[in-house]
Amino acid sequence: MPSDAEISSLSSTLKELNDRVAALAESAVATGNEDMARELFAVERALGGALRRLRRFSHTA
């Protein structure tokens, strides 16, 4: 079973990645690249879901 420290580290990494993808998506919107923005926002939603599941798991484990 993963340790609390491992779960915390993964959560932090996912949060940072999610923030970076969100920034890229916003940049794509600002430059008018709607196709890229749409895909990046989809990735952001998926990462956000993974982050919520990981955090929920860490609180129940």
Task: List each language-model region with its residue ranges.
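N-terminal acidic leader/helix
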Residues: 1-27
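Short, charge-rich amphipathic interface segments used for partner binding and complex assembly
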Residues: 26-61
